[in-house]
């Protein structure tokens, strides 16, 4: 398996920017839970790990193993999140930008950021290059996607112990048939995004019939 390229990182390293940071998020499309972002700064002389890919292309076991290896390889890693309340208040796009900004703040100072996706005019970033499909083309962004995915999945697994009805240890908050069936049966928890589930809101009796596990 050929390792992902460092061509984007090298373009800035060659300009004298040593702290180039890859940024990615996970959880934008979920019905429950926060959106989480990771920022990863790699050493200029780093050798890409061959297995690193977009986190969606890896198994949970592969991600867990690479998570530890990336932490060992990186100069700095920052995690940022935006809560369900923030998502409902400002919308998922702006909440995602908040999560990314918080992740970047935890690896400051940094010289230039490579961010997965396409940024809108409301993005609160400077010194940034947005790369569509960045987690498939940039090694540092792919590393960030793995870190963010593992951190969020572990958080949702902990929440699943409190709300076992929703299968969050398996679906991590995405709208799978299992999750939607549980919503029909038990209603919303405090961890569900009301702005994503407006059709379930009219009946107050339908709000959180699930009893948290002790």
From Swiss-Prot:
Q: What does this protein do?
A: Endonuclease that specifically degrades the RNA of RNA-DNA hybrids.
State the organism's lineage.
Answer: Bacteria, Bacillati, Cyanobacteriota, Cyanophyceae, Acaryochloridales
What is the native source organism of this protein?
Thermosynechococcus vestitus (strain NIES-2133 / IAM M-273 / BP-1)
First-tier enzyme category under EC: hydrolase
Task: List, in alphabetical order, the GO biological process terms annotated in this UniProt record.
Answer: DNA replication, removal of RNA primer; mismatch repair
Query: Member of which family?
Result: Belongs to the RNase HII family.
HAMAP family for the chain:
RNase_HII_B
What's its EC? 3.1.26.4
Q: Quote the cofactor binding remark.
A: Manganese or magnesium. Binds 1 divalent metal ion per monomer in the absence of substrate. May bind a second metal ion after substrate binding.
The UniProt catalytic activity note for this protein reads: Endonucleolytic cleavage to 5'-phosphomonoester
Q: What is this protein called?
A: Ribonuclease HII
Q: Which NCBIfam families match?
A: PRK00015.1-3 (NF000595)
Q: Where is the RNase H type-2 domain?
A: 18-208
The record, for PROSITE patterns, names: RNASE_H_2
Which GO molecular function, any one, fits this protein according to its record? Answer: RNA-DNA hybrid ribonuclease activity
User: Which UniProt keyword terms apply here?
Assistant: Cytoplasm, Endonuclease, Hydrolase, Manganese, Metal-binding, Nuclease
| Subcellular localization, as worded in the UniProt entry | Cytoplasm
Q: Which InterPro entries match?
A: RNase_HII, RNase_HII/HIII, RNase_HII/HIII_dom, RNaseH-like_sf, RNaseH_sf
The protein's required cofactors: Mn(2+); Mg(2+)
